Structures are given as C-alpha cells and as structure tokens.
Design a protein with these regions (language model features):
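Domain-level signal for soluble alpha/beta catalytic cores
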Residues: 2-384
C-alpha cells in the first residue's frame, strides 16, 4: 500500500502542484536555426515570431500530453532566463562586457544590462506579449498558463554589479536606494499588467539567494562593506516591495537557484545562511528549491518556511539525462518531512532544462522522461 493510499492530502488546484516543473525547456533545432538566421539578418522579426509561435504551440501540446497542470512557453522567445526581461524595461540597456558569467568550468556569452535612464515598465514589454500568446493556447482548456520572470532582486544586482555600472547609475539616480525603489515599482507594474492579461500563476526566478548562501561568493554582492544580513534585508525588501497590494487570486511563487548554464553550476552551499530572510519572510506562496546534489546541503532550512507555505523539492537534476533511483527520491522526500509537513511538499526537477538558449546537455526524450519520473513518484507519494 502506498503512502497516498494511507494518508489524505490537500487537492492542489493552484500552484505549486504535486508534480511540477521549473519552466524552461530545450529549444527545438528549428527554433535555434531561426534565431541564428535572425541574428544574421537572414529573416525578419515576423518570420522569427512565426517559428516561435509554432514551437511554443507544439510544446504546450507536449506538456498537456505529460499531464502537467501549469504550462509554460518554455522561455522559447528568450536568449537568457533573466536578461531579456531586464532589457524590456525602459531605462535599461543591453551591454556586452568583456567577460560573461563565470560558471563551474565554463564562461557564458558576454551579455549584461546597465542603467541608461529612469527605469519604468512599458506596455510593450516582451514578457507581456509572450504571455498573451501562451494564454491564447490554453483558453478553453484546464491548463494553467504560468509566467516566469527573474526576480526584482536579480534585476537590481545585474544593474549594480560590474565595471562602469555605478557611474551609469549616478547619471540618473541620486542613490542606489532610489534605483531599488524604481526596480520594485517597474516589476509591480509588470505583474499587474500580466494579471490584467489573465495571468494567475507567476513564478520569480532568483539566483541572488543562491549566491548569498555561498560562503565563498556572497561578498561579491555586498556593497561598501555591507554585512550578509544587511544585504539580505535589502534584497528581501526589493522583492517584497514589488509584491505589495496584488490581487488575492494571483499565485506568486519563487525558484531559488544556484545557476544553470549548459549543465554547469555557479554557486554552492545549503540554504541555511539565507533561510531567516528569503524562506521565512519573502511574500510568496511557495519555494522551488534545488536539492539535486550535495552542493545543496541538507533539509534543515525548511524548518524556517512558514507552516502554511509550500516547498517544491527539486530532487531530480535537469543538468543530465540519467534518471534518478526512484527509491532514493522517495527516501529523500521522507527525510524532508522532518522539517516541513508532507502535505506542504511537492516535487520537481531542480531547475529548468534550458535557462539559456544553449540548453543543458541532454536530449528532448530524456527531458520528458525526467518529467514522467517526477509525475510517477509524486503520484505514489501524494496520489497526485
């Protein structure tokens, strides 16, 4: 007899779901080819969009076949999981620094964002337009269209970290606190616009907390000798200020990430150093947490999550195609219940499959096999 047959669990009708996804999917070869042609001026934007629309429609159909409850557009219109959103705001420029982001054994493409004016939301933001198309594909179905965006704190850190960033800020802002306020407001306005377009399921992707949790890396984010605690207070405020006075039927969750690029990682360390801030105080309904390797630490920080909030355990890696041992995952879920109620736990892969257009090193078949395993295990545990 399975655990689901002996216990009664809350029926999930909104995110997070017992078997869930983080959101990005491997880009099809057709889409990659179209993006390359667009970059080389061989096709125009309308032709690229037609390919994007076709690939997103096919992806939504595959997600429906996988019996996912909340579906995404796979982030197929983005090059990066975060920068495209930043570039969509007024007052933020696309820059090409000397170096990309440094991951374990690999350096990314060199793209970034920099202040070039007062930061404001505008009604033509690409994430808003992308969501409208996704919703059109789910209208008349039971599928919930989910929009993922990088967290406000992630945007702020991108704008303040790096050579020449402080000078750019000083041209338009009297202080970084003023900048932070505008970032939160721009995000708040984007979120409300998404809501007006029909979004009821929003996920914030956030690598800032994964970086601050790393004992060897957090100081990179600290400004002017700032302590780890003050840094966390600052970033928590930026995120929470964007989430004030939102409609009650908008479900907001967050994915606390350690970096995901071409199957490599950026930071390491358990969630303990940041648990008292992000896990205890961020105004979201659920936390998608990475627990696919020893780098993630133990489950003890889950005790800081308020009892009424959900934790999605990212126990299956999205960085490789090898399937996890089923019993190992079942045992780890049981271990997590020492710190958070089983009824408030769900299961997913640790991250998306393609945080950037390069994608992780696995096949599409392996990607869907991972999701199928997540679903199968969740059904055994919760009867999902």
């Amino acid at each position: 007899m399975t655990q689901a047959q002996t216990l009664t669990f809350t029926n999930r009708t909104t995110s997070p779901f017992r078997y869930d996804i983080v959101g990005s999917f491997l880009r099809p070869a057709e889409l990659k080819a179209a993006r390359e042609k667009f970059a080389n001026h061989e096709i125009d934007h309308d032709e690229l969009k037609a390919v994007e629309d076709k690939c997103i429609k096919a992806l939504v159909e595959k997600q429906a076949q996988a019996e996912l409850h909340a579906v995404t557009d796979g982030e197929f219109r983005r090059s990066w999981w975060h920068l495209d959103t930043f570039w969509g705001f007024d007052g933020i420029a696309h820059t090409n620094p000397e170096h990309g982001y440094f991951f374990h054994d690999e350096e990314t493409r060199a793209d970034s964002a920099q202040v070039e004016g007062k930061i404001r939301f505008n009604g033509t933001h690409p994430d808003l337009e992308a969501f409208k198309y996704l919703k059109s594909l789910t209208d008349g179905t039971d599928l919930i269209p989910r929009q993922s965006i990088p967290a406000p704190a992630q945007c702020y850190e991108e704008l303040v970290l790096g050579e020449g960033k402080s000078e750019a800020i000083a041209e338009f802002y009297s202080s970084k606190a003023e900048l932070a306020k505008d970032v939160s407001q721009a995000y708040h306005d984007l979120i409300l616009a998404l809501y007006d377009a029909g979004c009821r399921d929003l996920k914030l992707d956030d690598c800032t907390w994964g970086s601050i949790a790393d004992d060897e890396f957090w100081h990179v984010f600290a400004e002017d000798g700032q302590s780890r605690e003050l840094l966390q207070e600052q970033l928590l405020k930026i995120n929470n200020d964007a989430l004030v006075n939102l409609p009650a039927d908008l479900v907001v969750t967050t994915h606390v990430c350690r970096g995901n690029y071409h199957s490599t990682w950026a930071t390491k360390g358990g969630y303990g150093p940041v648990a008292d801030y992000v896990l205890a105080k961020e105004n979201v309904a659920a936390f998608y947490l990475e627990y696919d390797s020893e780098r993630a630490g133990g489950f003890e920080p889950l005790a800081k999550v308020p009892a009424d909030k959900y934790v999605v355990l990212g126990l299956l890696t999205s960085k490789s195609g090898e399937l996890e041992d089923r019993q190992v995952i079942l045992d780890r879920i049981q271990e997590a219940t020492q710190y958070h109620d089983l009824d408030k736990l769900c299961l997913s892969t640790q991250c998306g499959f393609s945080s950037t257009e390069e994608g992780n090193i696995l096949t599409e078949e392996q990607q869907w096999a991972k999701i199928a395993l997540v679903k199968s295990i969740a059904e055994e545990v919760w009867g999902a």
